[in-house]
Amino acid sequence: MIKLIRGFRDILPGQVELWQDIESKARVLLENFGFREIRLPIMESTELFARGIGADTDIVEKEMYTFPDSKGRGQTLRPEATASVVRSYIEHGYAGSDPVQKFYTIGPMFRHERPQKGRYRQFYQINAEMFGVASPLADVQIMYMLHLFFTGLDVPDVVTHVNSLGCPECRPKFREALISFVSDKMDRLCSDCQRRADANPLRVIDCKVPGCKEAVQGAPSIQDHLCPDCKEHFEAVIKGLDGLNVPYEIDPRLVRGLDYYTRTTFEVQTTLLGAQNAVAGGGRYDGLVKILGGKETPAIGFAVGFDRLAALLGAEEKDFTVPPALFIAALGDEARKIAFGWLCDFNARGVRAEMDYEGKSLKSQMKQANRFNAGRVLILGENELQNGMAVLRNMDTKEQEEVALDGLTDRVAALINQG
C-alpha cells in the first residue's frame, strides 16, 4: 500500500467543513475591508524567494523544495506567499499605474522542516497584503483585522506581540551593537548562528536552538536604537491599537524569520498549541517591492497559519457536518429508476438528498438513512407505484404521510424548504 509522504496529510470530510467555515469567515472579513482575492501559482523562480526572503534565512538555506527545469534553472514550491504577491503586483503593472492595492490569497505553502504538532511540510495560509500606504494606520488596521478574525472564531487566549525592526537608517546602529554583543558568545552559538553573526545578526536573535536563545538573553533591544521617524511610527501604531482595544504586548525580541520586514512586525500567539504558539504573523516590508524590481512602495501584510488554527478550533470538537434533508429508499428496479430521477431533481433544486443505489432491503436503507442523520425518508416500492403515492416519513417525529407521485418533487421540496 502506498502511503502519504511524511509531513503531508489528507484533510478528510468532517475536517474539511471546519476549514470551509474558517475560510468563509476570512473571505467575508477581508472583502469587507476592501481586499480582493488573487490566485497565484504554487511554483516560482527560486531567485524570487532567495532575493525576497533572504539568502541567509533558514527557509532559503534549508527548507525550500527546489527543482531544476529542463534548462537547469531553479524552480521552487512557494514557502510563503508575500514574495509571490509582490512579484504579481510588479509584473502586472500595479506599482506604476495604481500603487494602492489590497490583495488576499488562500492556499498551500511548502517547507521541508521537521513535522510536529501544528507543523506540516505542506501547510495552508490565509495571506493579506496592502500596498502603497506608508501611514501607521495601515499597520493598525492589519492587526485590528486579525483581532476581529480570531474574536469572530471564538479563539481563546490569543494576544498580539508587536515590535519595530527599524529602517535602513537606524538598523545599522542596532546591527553594530548586536554584533558586538554576540562576538564574545560565539562558542555558545550553533554553527548556523556563528556563520550568520556578522552578515545577518538578526537571525541569531530569531534562532530557536535553546543554547542560542540562552546566549542572547540580555541582547541589545532594537527599541533603544530606533531613529526619530521609526520611533514616531511605532508610537502611533501602539496608540492606534489602544484606541481600538486590540490586546497586545510589546516584544523587543520579536524579529520573525524573514529578512524583508521593516518597522512594524507582529505575531498573534496562543498558549494552547505548545511550542508552536504563533497562529498568525506579519509586518511591514517597505523595501521588498524595490528589491524585486519595482518602484519603492510601502507595504504591509500578514499570514494566518490555517493548520494551527484548525487544530485549535478542532480541539473543541465542533460538528460542521450538514446532514441530508432527504433520503430516498427505493425498492425494485423500476422504483430505483424513478427515485434516481427525483434525486437529481432535488439536488438541482439545492435540496441535499441521498439514496441507496444497490437495491438493499427497506430495513437496511432505513439504517443507512439513520447513519446519514437524514431529516426525512421518501419510500417508493411496488405498492407505492401501484397506488401512485409515495410515503414521506419524518425521522424526528416518526410521523409519515402519503405524497402523490405526480409533481412529487415540487411538493416535497416545498415541505423541506418550509422546515
UniProtKB/Swiss-Prot annotation:
GO biological process annotation, one example: histidyl-tRNA aminoacylation
Keyword Plastid: no
GO molecular function, one term: histidine-tRNA ligase activity
Group of enzyme by EC: ligase
Protein location: Cytoplasm
KW Cytoplasm (keyword) present: yes
UniProt entry keywords in alphabetical sequence: Aminoacyl-tRNA synthetase, ATP-binding, Cytoplasm, Ligase, Nucleotide-binding, Protein biosynthesis
Enzyme Commission number: 6.1.1.21
InterPro entries assigned: aa-tRNA-synth_II, aa-tRNA-synth_II/BPL/LPL, Anticodon-bd, Anticodon-bd_dom_sf, His-tRNA-ligase, HisRS-like_core, HisRS/HisZ, HisRS_anticodon
Principal localisation: cytoplasm
Catalytic activity annotation: tRNA(His) + L-histidine + ATP = L-histidyl-tRNA(His) + AMP + diphosphate + H(+)
Assembly and binders: Homodimer.
PANTHER family cross-referenced by the UniProt entry: HISTIDINE--TRNA LIGASE, MITOCHONDRIAL-RELATED, HISTIDYL-TRNA SYNTHETASE
Family to which the UniProt record says this protein belongs: Belongs to the class-II aminoacyl-tRNA synthetase family.
Protein name per the record: Histidine--tRNA ligase
Lineage, opening ranks: Bacteria, Pseudomonadati, Thermodesulfobacteriota, Desulfobacteria, Desulfobacterales
